Design a protein with these regions (language model features):
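Conserved protein kinase catalytic core
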Residues: 58, 113-114, 223, 240-242, ...
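ATP-binding pocket architecture of kinase catalytic cores
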Residues: 31, 41-152
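Active-site acidic catalytic loop and adjacent metal/ATP-binding pocket
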Residues: 29-44, 49-51, 197-245
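Juxta-kinase regulatory segment immediately upstream of eukaryotic protein kinase catalytic domains
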Residues: 1-27
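Active-site activation/catalytic loop segments of kinase-like enzymes and analogous catalytic loops
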Residues: 76, 244-275, 285
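Short, well-ordered amphipathic alpha-helices
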Residues: 10-14, 76-82, 198-199, 268-271
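Active-site catalytic-loop/activation-segment of kinase and kinase-like phosphoryl-transfer enzymes
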Residues: 1-5, 152-202
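Glycine-rich, phosphate-binding/catalytic loops in enzymes
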Residues: 67, 122-123, 231, 248-250
């Protein structure tokens, strides 16, 4: 496997089996934070594209192993989205996929910014943007007859960090590093046996349910504002799953970011597909 890094030379990038005849690589820069994968913006004599490579670990936390084949899942999801007119413009088109080296070349959606600033109170999602994000979820959840590779390993990784580790009394995380006092506050949750049973059941459903195509990581880091447009990226935790999970994660991150409380009802009113609100609230936490 060719191991690409942020410092890989233009010469070596030029040698990748991704380029058109006569196309010359001119520039490479890091494109975004890239929690899971290496993500580079490549400018050539003909175009600007995004190059992604998955590793056998989480790029931001190399000590955490992760399924290296996750790009295959993302590729299949992006191709399914590109075939659905209502949501095709939200996400990049797959231009080339090189399975041997876990490399994917994507359409460059343009320079933009994600919504991570909302956690610090520096950004507010407008009702119009909220509606657009709900319409995106409605659109992908409505996609049927798609063949997505099984994502059990990625689903298990997500399950571990959402439904299991946070509810262990001794999980190795010091929550006071995030906010002083949070560690003590967490004890009321890690010692609650009734809550533990409910979380276990919900986690089991998350692992087993496969009725809809889901994004799988629908949070502000996956939403991009590019000019006046909204884009959605990085569905590597997606696949066939539980639509209520996407909605619950959406709501939970709006809660964390202290967005207007009325947004929750707006989301559930605008979402037009059948969904169990109790499940959504369960995933929301």
């Amino acid at each position: 496997m060719l191991d690409i890094t942020a410092n890989t030379s233009l010469y070596d990038i030029q040698g990748l089996p991704l380029w058109e005849n006569g196309e010359q690589v001119l520039e490479r820069t890091v494109a975004g934070e890239g929690n899971m994968n290496l993500v580079l913006r490549i400018k050539t004599t003909r175009r600007s594209v995004i190059l992604k490579q998955s590793k056998a670990y989480v790029r931001k936390y190399p000590q955490i192993p992760a399924p290296i084949e996750r790009l295959e899942i993302e590729k299949a999801i992006l191709e399914a989205i590109s075939d659905q007119k209502s949501v095709a413009s939200f996400s990049p088109r797959v231009l080339h996929y090189h399975a041997e080296n876990y490399l994917m070349l994507l359409e460059d959606l343009g320079s933009g910014s994600d919504f991570l600033d909302i956690y610090a109170g520096n950004k507010l999602i407008s009702p119009e943007q909220l509606s657009i994000l709900v319409d995106y979820l409605t659109g992908i959840h409505a996609i049927d007859s798609v063949k997505i590779p099984a994502s059990k390993a990625m689903r298990a990784l997500n399950h571990q960090h959402i439904f299991h580790l946070p509810f262990l009394a001794d999980n190795g995380f010091n929550l006071d590093d995030i906010q002083v006092g949070l560690q003590a506050l967490s004890k009321s949750y890690t010692s609650d046996e009734r809550l533990a049973k409910q979380v276990t059941l919900l986690g089991k459903r998350y692992l087993e349910e496969e009725h809809a195509l889901i994004h799988g990581d629908f949070y502000p880091g996956s939403w991009l504002e590019v000019g006046s447009d909204l884009k959605v990226i990085d569905p590597e935790f997606g696949g066939m799953g539980d639509a209520a999970f996407d909605l619950g994660v959406f709501l939970a991150h709006l809660d964390l970011a202290k967005q207007p409380p009325g947004y929750a009802s707006l989301i559930l009113e605008r979402y037009t597909l059948p969904v169990d609100p109790v499940l959504v609230q369960g995933y929301r936490g």
